[in-house]
Swiss-Prot record:
Transmembrane segments: none annotated. The gene is L2. This is Minor capsid protein L2. Interacts with major capsid protein L1. Interacts with E2; this interaction inhibits E2 transcriptional activity but not the DNA replication function E2. Interacts with host GADD45GIP1. Interacts with host HSPA8; this interaction is required for L2 nuclear translocation. Interacts with host importins KPNB2 and KPNB3. Forms a complex with importin alpha2-beta1 heterodimers via interaction with the importin alpha2 adapter. Interacts with host DYNLT1; this interaction is essential for virus intracellular transport during entry. InterPro entries: Late_L2 (IPR000784). Minor protein of the capsid that localizes along the inner surface of the virion, within the central cavities beneath the L1 pentamers. Plays a role in capsid stabilization through interaction with the major capsid protein L1. Once the virion enters the host cell, L2 escorts the genomic DNA into the nucleus by promoting escape from the endosomal compartments and traffic through the host Golgi network. It comes from the Viruses. Highly phosphorylated. Keywords: Capsid protein, Cytoplasmic inwards viral transport, Disulfide bond, DNA-binding, Host endosome, Host Golgi apparatus, Host nucleus, Host-virus interaction, Late protein, Microtubular inwards viral transport, Phosphoprotein, Viral penetration into host nucleus, Virion, Virus entry into host cell. The keyword Phosphoprotein applies. It is found in: Virion; Host nucleus; Host early endosome; Host Golgi apparatus. A motif (Nuclear localization signal) lies at residues 1-12, 443-451. GO terms for biological process: microtubule-dependent intracellular transport of viral material towards nucleus; symbiont entry into host cell; viral penetration into host nucleus. Disulfide bonds join 21-27.
Length: 460
């Protein structure tokens, strides 16, 4: 048999228990302090309020009456009442015109004119004299004679005094009357030259270039090409100076100029002509500077090694440079001799002129010794005049026509003596018409000549 649980009854509230158990003295220990507001919290508020003032907030366990001053009701502005019925316009009074009234309304004229500021004439009440006022409309004409003053000014020039100014200023005169000025504006005496002073305080040159002050020149901004953020790469290809785009791509071989920034777009993986320019997407403008006694040509390149989804590229910056030439000191000046003839030389050397039949030639014998076969030529020399050199050539020789050349000749008063060359000291070996070679070089071993890709003035 299942037992049913007893129903739990609700306990009476503290106020109900206090009303029944107060007189009998059987109230629990927590009922009386709670109803009489004498709990620990009430005691803290009671003794703490002596040192802390909360104003009229009414903080406590009492009823919500707003403290001692109570709550201040908020004043509200009364809303004006709007009538719901139809509104009527107030009538306007209109002056009516009778049928017999004239259509033109005459203006009302004032009977008396009052002049402000004028004294009022009051007629006397008792007998007296009369005041007669007369007014004339004709204006008064005054006979005033105008007196004219004539002022004359004369200027006398002192020839012993030199006026430094060119234009002479006019003297100060009165504004009224007639003014007579007899002076010239431009003087006829010579002008005095005043030297200008220079403002240069200090200068490195011996002679100043101008008379303006030397401006304070600040330090020129240096290009940060050798910082740790840039990778230094030396380029040896000469195309880097004129057309650097040929080292990066094959698509656009057109030359765009050396003073512009070059941009490249690589949609696919490609191999550049130079491996040093791998993944280069931009080359900045060139810069020429001096570096350790050399002229250096530089460009800054931007790599595009990685791209994000937003389109931003990630890559390092590279400093490409190439040394053009060393900066050497000033070369020694060498005096050049004139290559033209003097004024007294009138002889001409004509290679196309025919030999003179009346002129007798004296052949000069020459001895030749060589190990290679050749055709002997007859050479004739004369001390002055035209010189004829007949040559026997193995084939036809093309002669380019040119101008006549004037060479200095020996004087007729001095006997002719041929000049012996200092070098070579040994015998002369001739092979052909215009070529000679030393015999020791005939059997010399020929070496293959290797041409370096560097510039001629750049050290390896």
């Amino acid at each position: 048999m299942a037992h049913s649980r007893a129903r739990r009854r609700k306990r009476a509230s503290a106020t109900q228990l206090y009303q029944t158990c107060k007189a009998a003295g059987t109230c629990p220990s927590d009922i009386i302090p709670k109803v009489e507001h004498n709990t620990i919290a009430d005691q803290i508020l009671k003794w703490g309020s002596l040192g802390v003032f909360f104003g009229g907030l009414g903080i406590g366990t009492g009823s919500g009456t707003g403290g001692r001053t109570g709550y201040i009701p908020l004043q509200s502005t009364p809303r004006p009442e709007i009538p719901s019925g139809p509104t009527t316009r107030p009538p306007i009074l209109v002056d009516t015109v009778a049928p017999g009234d004239p259509s033109i309304v005459s203006l009302v004229e004032e009977s008396a004119i009052i002049n402000s500021g004028a004294p009022e004439l009051v007629p006397p009440s008792h007998g007296g004299f009369e005041i007669t006022t007369s007014e004339s409309t004709t204006p008064a004409i005054l006979d005033v004679s105008v007196t004219t003053h004539t002022t004359s000014t004369s200027v006398f020039r002192n020839p012993s005094f030199a006026d430094p100014s060119v234009v002479q200023s006019q003297p100060a005169v009165e504004a009224g009357g007639h003014i007579l000025i007899s002076t010239s504006t431009i003087s006829s005496h010579p002008v005095e030259e005043i030297p200008l002073d220079t403002f240069i305080v200090s200068s490195s040159d011996s002679n100043p270039a101008s008379s303006t002050p030397i401006p304070a020149s600040g330090a020129r901004p240096r290009i940060g090409l050798y910082s740790k953020a840039l990778h230094q790469v030396q380029v040896t290809d000469p195309a880097f100076l004129s057309s650097p785009q040929r080292l990066i791509t094959f698509d656009n071989p057109a030359y765009e100029g050396e003073d512009v920034s070059l941009e490249f777009a690589h949609n696919t993986i490609h191999q550049p002509p130079d491996d040093a320019f791998m993944d280069i997407i931009r080359l900045h403008r060139p810069a020429i500077q001096s570096r350790r006694g050399r002229v250096r040509f530089s460009r800054i390149g931007q790599r595009g090694s990685m791209y994000t989804r937003s389109g931003k590229h990630i890559g390092g910056r590279i400093h490409f440079y190439q040394d053009i030439s060393p900066i050497s000191a000033a070369a020694e000046e060498i005096e050049l001799h004139p290559l033209v003839a003097t004024a007294h030389d009138t002889s001409l050397f004509d290679i196309y002129a025919e030999p003179d039949p009346d002129f007798t030639e004296e052949p000069v014998p020459l001895s030749f010794s060589t190990s290679t076969p050749f055709q002997r030529s007859s050479v004739s020399a004369t001390p002055w005049g035209n010189t004829t050199v007949p040559l026997s050539l193995p084939g036809d020789m093309f002669v380019q026509p040119g101008p006549d050349i004037i060479f200095p000749t020996a004087s007729t008063t001095t006997p002719y003596s041929p000049v012996t060359p200092a070098l070579p000291t040994g015998p002369v070996f001739i092979s052909g018409a215009t070529f000679y070679l030393y015999p020791a070089w005939y059997f010399a071993r020929k070496r293959r000549k290797r041409v370096s890709l560097f510039f001629a003035d750049v050290a390896a």
